[in-house]
């Protein structure tokens, strides 16, 4: 658990450092216009930057497998580890990493100063990760506190980290990633007309899909002993009550 508790905080600084050059350096060198004259769409250019950052995040996760295999072999008996739960935790880390990359790419598109891009990305990633949870902890919104908490990454990551993959959590991460890719596209396409209406329409569609997905969902308990699921006997008992 300590690995998966610490890793998001490492990502909080590592990923902005990886992504801060994405577009900021292009702006500083004056090559961004040249970049967009290539036979690629703006979306393809943004996604190529995004995928490049995501690949580096994947490589940064590989050394942590040593920790997993060490714990697995040193267990008593050997192999005494919840593989399903660990797999779920890695899914959560990957989703956080993918989200932070999209935030970092967006922040890099805002400025030509890499340091500014880094600082803004760190702040925004921190707010998305823990900010909403901190706001909800003050009970400012009453009955809406759970909704506010659900707007942040921390709530969804804790669910996945336990080894429970809920389509609502997956959809949340996909939505946040898509929104920041759209924000990046909007910033880089400000020179074009008709961008603003398309931006708002696409953003609204993404949010509506996420809202619909909160009502129709599936939940998968990856833990080997299904510790986060009701047993068949309990389900039968509750149905007969």
PLM feature segments, named:
Residues 3-25:
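Long, hydrophobic alpha-helical segments
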Residues 193-216:
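Internal/C-terminal transmembrane anchor helices
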Residues 5, 10, 48, 52-112:
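Secretory targeting signals
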Residues 15-19, 67, 103, 183-184, ...:
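Hydrophobic/aromatic residues in alpha-helical transmembrane segments
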Residues 1, 117-187:
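Terminal transmembrane helical anchor/hairpin motif
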Residues 208-241:
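Juxtamembrane extramembrane loops of integral membrane proteins
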Residues 18-36, 50:
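Transmembrane helix boundary and interhelical loop/hinge segments in multi-pass membrane proteins
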């Amino acid at each position: 658990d300590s690995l998966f508790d610490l890793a998001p905080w490492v990502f909080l600084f590592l990923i902005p450092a990886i992504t801060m050059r994405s577009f900021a350096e292009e702006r500083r060198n004056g090559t961004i216009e040249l970049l967009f004259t290539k036979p690629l769409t703006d979306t393809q250019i943004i996604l190529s930057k995004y995928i490049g950052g995501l690949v580096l995040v994947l490589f940064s996760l590989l050394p942590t497998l040593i920790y997993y295999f060490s714990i697995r072999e040193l267990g008593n008996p050997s192999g005494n580890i919840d593989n399903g739960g660990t797999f779920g935790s890695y899914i959560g880390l990957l989703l956080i990493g993918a989200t932070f990359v999209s935030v970092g790419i967006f922040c890099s598109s805002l400025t030509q100063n890499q340091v500014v891009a880094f600082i803004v990305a760190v702040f925004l990633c921190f707010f998305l990760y823990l900010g909403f949870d901190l706001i909800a902890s003050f009970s400012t919104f009453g009955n809406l506190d759970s909704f506010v908490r659900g707007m942040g990454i921390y709530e969804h990551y804790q669910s996945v980290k336990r080894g429970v993959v809920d389509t609502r959590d997956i959809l949340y991460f996909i939505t946040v990633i898509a929104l920041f890719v759209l924000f990046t596209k909007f910033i880089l396409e400000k020179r074009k007309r008709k961008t603003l209406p398309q931006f708002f329409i696409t953003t609204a569609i993404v949010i509506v899909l996420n809202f619909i997905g909160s009502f129709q969902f599936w939940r998968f308990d990856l833990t080997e002993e299904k510790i986060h699921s009701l047993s068949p006997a309990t389900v039968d008992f509750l149905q007969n009550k």
